[in-house]
């Protein structure tokens, strides 16, 4: 008899638990003194507290939590929990307190929580790469670079990189790499030409200068007819009109014209004259010897489609340090349908704090943008443009500036 009673009680307990867990809203058992019965009452939802248990006649009464108090689950408590008052040192408020959530604090970028303190993420030394990036809750995990990989920098983000395959770039292996440095390649001068940039920053600024602020209906046709050298054919002009906005058409036309006439004296003269601009840009940017991780951060900060790690690797191998930023900016422009590189750079500078650029790099990029927009360069662009198209369309361009 006792065994039968025990089984019945266990079954009843399981049935009640199943009922209270599976129904919605969730239920709880409450003994009602007035009727001397166990009642199945509704629990209170998140953001409220239990004001009055249910009765045989009335449902459970719940009331909203007051300011600075919360409950984050269905419950039977007659009071709300007090929100955490402040975040710890080196933390920021990820989510403010409200009636359904406690204040959520998180360590600032580059730090993680260890007991009560936000400690700086570990930086992996040369010869070691990041295998698990640090998070606000976890430290960086480093591991020694395996055979065929290397890391030549101290970084909390950079993984080990694969040794350069010299033969891919038409070069010879002169010194085998190890865990702390890459393979060293050498080759003839022809191999160094692989860092070619189709349109430099100065040329792009010059070509975009040629875009009139006010368009005449036949501006592109006038420009096509008056450009010296080999003419851009009608089919190409129509394709440019179909595929690009009015603001982009002039840039695309001049870019194509330059490619078709690269051996013409007029193009060579323009390139020579614009060397003044190129030398100044090199003075601003060329000295910035950035690591792989810093170059990747710069590319990540640009809007639109990103230049990937593989392209950055190839650029580091094919270009000398002074040309690497310019080459990557050229790749970004091509990848994004010839978007304005200077506008992309200005976007990157607005978000430079997020990506932790070195101060010297930020200053160099700002100086470059100011220089390319300066009155001195404006006068040079105007002079070159009028020399290029001759006197026949001077009045058209000048009226549009």
Swiss-Prot record:
Reported induction: Up-regulated by increasing calcium-concentration in the medium and estrogens. Down-regulated by glucocorticoids.
Membrane-spanning ranges: none
A Pfam family annotated for this chain is: Death_TNFRSF11B
Q: Where are the TNFR-Cys repeats?
A: 24-62, 65-105, 107-142, 145-185
Q: What is its main location?
A: secreted
The UniProt entry, under SUPFAM superfamilies, shows: DEATH domain (SSF47986), TNF receptor-like (SSF57586)
What is one Gene Ontology biological process annotated in the Swiss-Prot or TrEMBL record?
signal transduction
GO cellular component entries: extracellular matrix; extracellular region; extracellular space; plasma membrane; receptor complex
> What are the residue boundaries of the Death domain, all occurrences included?
198-269, 270-365
Q: Which GO terms describe its molecular function?
A: cytokine activity; heparan sulfate binding; signaling receptor activity
What kind of modification does the protein receive after translation?
N-glycosylated. Contains sialic acid residues.
Record text on subunit structure and interactions: Homodimer. Interacts with TNFSF10 and TNFSF11.
What's this chain's function? Acts as a decoy receptor for TNFSF11/RANKL and thereby neutralizes its function in osteoclastogenesis. Inhibits the activation of osteoclasts and promotes osteoclast apoptosis in vitro. Bone homeostasis seems to depend on the local ratio between TNFSF11 and TNFRSF11B. May also play a role in preventing arterial calcification. May act as decoy receptor for TNFSF10/TRAIL and protect against apoptosis. TNFSF10/TRAIL binding blocks the inhibition of osteoclastogenesis.
Q: What is the protein name for this chain?
A: Tumor necrosis factor receptor superfamily member 11B
Species of origin: Homo sapiens (Human)
Lineage, uppermost ranks = Eukaryota, Metazoa, Chordata, Craniata, Vertebrata
From the UniProt record, report the name of the gene that encodes this protein: TNFRSF11B
